[in-house]
């Protein structure tokens, strides 16, 4: 019966799950409980218990299976085998392990989320604190500013009322409201914040000021009321507030402050119309700005500056130096009658007037003042340290100067010089076996390199005068002696080539006496050493003499200062740009220093020694090659390290401008006036040979220029259009073509474009490597430009003994040839009492009615002069002919 009842209940129940579904995946258990209330009341409540899926599954899995009920009867269930039990046990263990792992991960996630939430909360709290602090600071600043404005308004209102007020009695009568006692303030309610204390209002406050202050107080009260926390319901009755005394009603106040206005109130004349608060604020702002402007105009102290005025200055620069606006400066110039723009240049006098008008002090300076303080201060004795000597080797050409230097350096420089003569000035540093250092400067001996020798003598400490024992004193030897004495430099005589069979050192010593050089062997003070550069004889004695002389001179310099020195040689390298060989005389030159060398400036990008090795710094008496200059400096120029690029550029531009002015003045003086130049050109009196000189180094270009300019004369002038360094370019060819010039290339070549252009335009490019070849060729060109010389050749004299007057011919002189001969067609002069009265040609020459070509001495002849008939007896006829001789 119970089974049938169960089946009936099962059929009548609606369920979405099958009856036999397993309970492994079920996570919710439902049930009902009875909830009890007061007074015996109760209620049945449905309750659900949720379980974790893993745990439920494990529990269900771990629970032993109930024996299945057989459909036909109660047969005993089949038992599990050992393998099935072991598998089930393993599954249970794995499921428990997985559940433990998931639980650990969940706890870790909860911990991370808790930490993240705490960090986020802390960050938000910090941001809120910072925002609150910033808001508090802004509020405090606004409050302070508002208080200052209110205080300023009160002061201005008080000053205005005092200025416009009448005597005390009428004022009191006119404003009875000011004498009324102030209404008593209402007592503060309990628990309220203390009222803000306000500054007392002056008794003479204007109506508009009163309105403004009252509006401000009303706004603050509203803000305080809004900021008070609302009272919670049920917190008790609020304390009773005593009614405050109403403010006195002001005429026109309701209509302005009210939310609306009717037509009757607007048209009625009971109250007086007043200005709005916005209008009052605008008026106060205008008054405040006007007062501030007046105060600035009256009380402001003008800054008086000292304005430095060069010889010329632009309007923009003048305005910058006065800290003024450019339009104001232009307006001031217009008042002076000068119409100028911002970029226009004005003179120092006009600029001084403008500076005085602006109330500043002017200081006139010259352009040359940019070089003041360029060389620095003198060094103290404590800063000086011993430096190596600088030795210059000088002498006549081919006397062995470079060979002697080679022997000292153990190198072979002379073999690389064209023609066996030195055409560059070179600087080298030699380290002796003892560790002592010497700096040698090799100078050319050719007569064209006088300027190079002068430069070498000016930067040196000791001069070694090389004289060949078999040749004696020569012209360039004398010149070297003159340069050394002009520079006040001690001389050491090196008598070279003593290995020659015809060497005579004593003759050299005797010849030097003529030029005030007395060697020690002749009782003087000048050291002399007999050496042989080829055999390397006497080199040790020469080094000892140099060191002894250097010790006597006590050579010192300060290495801890900005570098100064001299440019020994300069050139333009195709790959490296402008290269200058400099000799540091003071301080230490470092890579990256900003230097000024003559008209060029730049930053030292690299330094190389005489062996081509890079250097970071160079001390006193060190010769180096520097790279990085803006151009090729002139040889012999002084280089100085300056503090910044601006000053270096200013000094270089000033020197370039002076050089251009000097060149223009020299050219104008050489050409004379324009009228004289045009007259010479038209008459063809003076011709010229135009040259474009390009050399490998600056010294060679200078030497060639000086040599060729000496070859000019009164009829042919040698004009050097350009003397530069570097290879020949297209611009050089174009310059030569425009001036019909010849390009002289000394140890340089033309690039492909320049060669093509020169071949097309017919420009002559001549290449040289020895300087005397240049001199010979230019001299030949100058002679070729000379006009041929007409030379007069005397033929003879004839005396007029009788004058005949022949019809259709005119007067004919019967003459007797007293000397030489008379030739027909030759030139004649008619002399009367030793004075030439006519010069012309013979038109006819006859002897006994026959025309003859010439008549010799002792014969008579008849002469007829072309275009002249004033013949007298006793006149003498001089006969000559003109022949042309090449110049």
UniProtKB/Swiss-Prot annotation:
Residues 496-499 are annotated as: G4. This is Translation initiation factor IF-2. It comes from Acidiphilium cryptum (strain JF-5). Residues 420-424 are annotated as: G2. GO terms for molecular function: GTP binding; GTPase activity; guanosine tetraphosphate binding; translation initiation factor activity. It comes from the Bacteria. The keyword Cytoplasm applies. The keyword Transcription regulation does not apply. Residues 532-534 are annotated as: G5. The gene is infB. Belongs to the TRAFAC class translation factor GTPase superfamily. Classic translation factor GTPase family. IF-2 subfamily. Residues 1-259 are annotated as: Disordered. Residues 386-556 form the tr-type G domain. Residues 95-111, 119-158, 250-259 have a biased composition (Basic and acidic residues). Keywords: Cytoplasm, GTP-binding, Initiation factor, Nucleotide-binding, Protein biosynthesis. It is found in: Cytoplasm. Residues 395-402 are annotated as: G1. One of the essential components for the initiation of protein synthesis. Protects formylmethionyl-tRNA from spontaneous hydrolysis and promotes its binding to the 30S ribosomal subunits. Also involved in the hydrolysis of GTP during the formation of the 70S ribosomal complex. Pfam families: EF-G_D2, GTP_EFTU, GTP_EFTU_D2, IF-2, IF2_assoc, IF2_N. Residues 442-445 are annotated as: G3. GO terms for cellular component: cytoplasm. GTP binds at residues 395-402, 442-446, 496-499. Residues 62-94, 159-210 have a biased composition (Low complexity).
């Amino acid at each position: 019966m119970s089974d049938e009842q169960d089946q009936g209940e099962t059929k009548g129940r609606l369920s979405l799950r099958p009856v036999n579904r397993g309970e492994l995946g079920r996570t919710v258990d439902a049930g009902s409980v009875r909830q009890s209330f007061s007074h015996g009341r109760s209620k049945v409540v449905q309750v659900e218990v949720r379980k974790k899926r893993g745990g439920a599954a494990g529990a269900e899995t771990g629970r032993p299976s109930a024996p299945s009920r057989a459909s036909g009867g109660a047969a005993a269930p089949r038992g599990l085998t050992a393998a099935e039990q072991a598998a089930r046990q393993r599954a249970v263990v794995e499921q428990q392990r997985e559940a433990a792992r998931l639980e650990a991960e969940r706890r870790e996630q909860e911990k991370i989320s808790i930490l993240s939430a705490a960090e986020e909360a802390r960050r938000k709290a910090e941001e809120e604190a910072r925002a609150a602090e910033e808001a508090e600071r802004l509020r405090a600043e606004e409050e302070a500013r508002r208080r200052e404005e209110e205080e300023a308004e009160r002061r201005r209102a008080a000053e205005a009322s005092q200025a416009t007020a009448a005597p005390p009695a009428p004022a009191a009568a006119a404003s009875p409201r000011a004498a009324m006692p102030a209404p008593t303030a209402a007592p503060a309610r309990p628990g309220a914040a203390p009222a803000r204390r306000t500054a007392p209002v002056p008794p003479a406050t204007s109506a508009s000021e009163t309105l403004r202050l009252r509006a401000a107080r009303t706004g603050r009260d509203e803000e305080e009321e809004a900021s008070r926390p609302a009272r919670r319901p049920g917190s008790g009755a609020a304390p009773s507030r005593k009614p405050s005394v109403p403010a006195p009603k002001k005429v026109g106040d309701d209509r302005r402050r009210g939310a609306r206005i009717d037509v009757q109130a607007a048209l009625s004349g009971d109250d007086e119309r007043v200005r709005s608060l916005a209008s009052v604020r605008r008026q106060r702002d205008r008054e405040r700005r006007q007062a501030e402007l007046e105060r600035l105009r009256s009380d402001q102290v003008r800054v008086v500056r000292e304005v430095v005025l060069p010889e010329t200055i632009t309007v923009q620069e003048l305005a910058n130096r006065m800290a003024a606006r450019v339009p104001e400066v232009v307006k001031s110039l217009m008042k002076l009658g000068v119409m100028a723009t911002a970029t226009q240049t004005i003179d120092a006098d006009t600029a001084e007037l403008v500076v005085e008008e602006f109330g500043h002090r002017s200081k006139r300076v010259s352009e040359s003042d940019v070089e003041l303080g360029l060389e620095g201060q003198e060094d103290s004795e404590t800063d000086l340290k011993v430096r190596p000597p600088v030795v210059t080797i000088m002498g006549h050409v081919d006397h062995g100067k470079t060979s002697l230097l080679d022997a000292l350096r153990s190198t072979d420089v002379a073999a690389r010089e064209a023609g066996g003569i030195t055409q560059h000035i070179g600087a080298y540093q030699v380290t002796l076996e003892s560790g002592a250092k010497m700096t040698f400067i090799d100078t050319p001996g050719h007569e064209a390199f006088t300027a190079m020798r002068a430069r070498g003598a000016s930067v040196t400490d000791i001069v070694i005068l090389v004289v060949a024992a078999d040749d004696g004193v020569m012209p360039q030897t004398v010149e070297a002696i003159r340069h050394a004495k002009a520079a006040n430099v001690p001389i050491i005589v090196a008598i070279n080539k003593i290995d020659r069979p015809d060497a005579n050192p004593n003759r050299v010593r005797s010849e030097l006496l003529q030029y005030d050089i007395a060697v020690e062997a002749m009782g003087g003070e000048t050291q002399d050493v007999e050496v042989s550069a080829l055999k390397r004889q006497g080199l040790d004695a020469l080094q000892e003499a140099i060191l002894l002389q250097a010790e006597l001179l006590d050579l010192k310099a300060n290495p801890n200062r900005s570098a100064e020195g001299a440019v020994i040689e300069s050139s333009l390298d195709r790959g490296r740009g402008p290269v200058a060989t400099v000799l540091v005389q003071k301080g230490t030159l470092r890579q990256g220093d900003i230097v000024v060398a003559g008209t060029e400036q730049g930053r030292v990008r690299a330094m190389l020694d005489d062996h081509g090795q890079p250097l970071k710094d160079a001390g006193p008496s060190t010769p180096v090659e520097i790279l990085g200059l803006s151009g090729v400096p002139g040889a012999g120029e002084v280089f100085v390290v300056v503090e910044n690029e601006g000053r270096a550029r200013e000094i270089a531009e000033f020197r370039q401008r002076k050089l251009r002015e000097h060149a223009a003045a020299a050219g104008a003086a050489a050409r004379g006036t324009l009228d004289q130049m045009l007259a010479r050109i038209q008459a063809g009196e003076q011709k010229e040979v135009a040259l474009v000189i390009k050399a490998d180094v600056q010294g060679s270009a200078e030497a060639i220029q000086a040599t060729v300019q000496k070859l000019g004369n009164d009829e042919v002038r040698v004009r050097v259009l350009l003397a530069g360094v570097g290879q020949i370019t297209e611009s050089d060819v174009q310059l030569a073509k425009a001036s019909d010039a010849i390009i002289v290339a000394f140890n340089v070549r033309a690039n492909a474009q320049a060669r093509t252009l020169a071949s097309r335009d017919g420009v002559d490019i001549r290449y040289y490597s020895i300087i005397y070849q240049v001199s010979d060729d230019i001299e030949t060109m100058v002679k070729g430009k000379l006009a041929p010389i007409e030379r007069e050749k005397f033929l003879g004299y004839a005396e007029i003994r009788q004058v005949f007057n022949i019809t259709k011919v005119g007067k004919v002189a019967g003459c007797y040839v007293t000397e030489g001969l008379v030739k027909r067609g030759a030139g004649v002069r008619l002399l009367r009492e030793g004075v030439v009265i006519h010069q012309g040609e013979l038109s006819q020459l006859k002897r006994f009615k026959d025309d003859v070509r010439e008549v010799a001495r002792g014969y008579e002849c008849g002469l007829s002069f072309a275009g002249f008939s004033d013949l007298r007896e006793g006149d003498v006829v001089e006969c000559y002919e003109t022949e042309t001789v090449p110049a």
